[in-house]
Amino acid sequence: DDLSSFSIEKKEVRPVWITISIPKNTEKGAYNAKVLITSPTTKQQELNISLDVIDMTLPEPAKWTFHLDQWQHPSAVARVNKVSVWSDEHFKALKPQMQMLANLGQKVITTTLNKDPWHVQTFDPYEDMIIWTKEKDGSWSYDYTVFDKWVSFMMDLGIKKMINCYSIVPWNNEIHYKDAATGKFVDVVAKPGTDEFTKIW
């Protein structure tokens, strides 16, 4: 949870995750500290924690060889934080989440070429990062504004080895685009091997 506080019923167990950042120049050895637990109705309690630092230093996460590929879901972050998708407030809310992922050695940026390529397998549909527009003369144009902003944002955090683009063959072969003649968005089925697929792709 990214909450500053929450209520717990009495006799209920709630795990707590504690992250400790260790500077690279820290000498090896055992380090002790206390965790203070406070409540408005009970006295303060102390828990002892011990941390053993070994004589080994990890390289920067971007240099780790393990290929970590956790899919990102920006739309979910927008809903939880009650902000508009792709707004400045959205990217501000995304930063701590994605920075945490970068610090774990994430190598891949998840992007969506079209709206919800997995046909809503998650609570929040995936928003498209590229706006496809069928112009009045039948030609196609593509707005990469969101795609470029998202990729640059992730690369600035240190995630830059690979970009996964989903998907040339989306769920149900459905393509989402804007019809310039009507100003409305249209969903059309374009199966591989058909004239419609060739024309769109």
List where the protein language model places each region:
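Surface-exposed binding patches on compact interaction domains or structured appendages
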Residues: D1-I18
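Aromatic-lined carbohydrate-binding surfaces of glycoside hydrolases
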Residues: S21, N32-S39, Q45-W201
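Short beta-strand and strand-turn-strand segments in soluble, beta-rich domains
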Residues: D1-S4, T26, K43
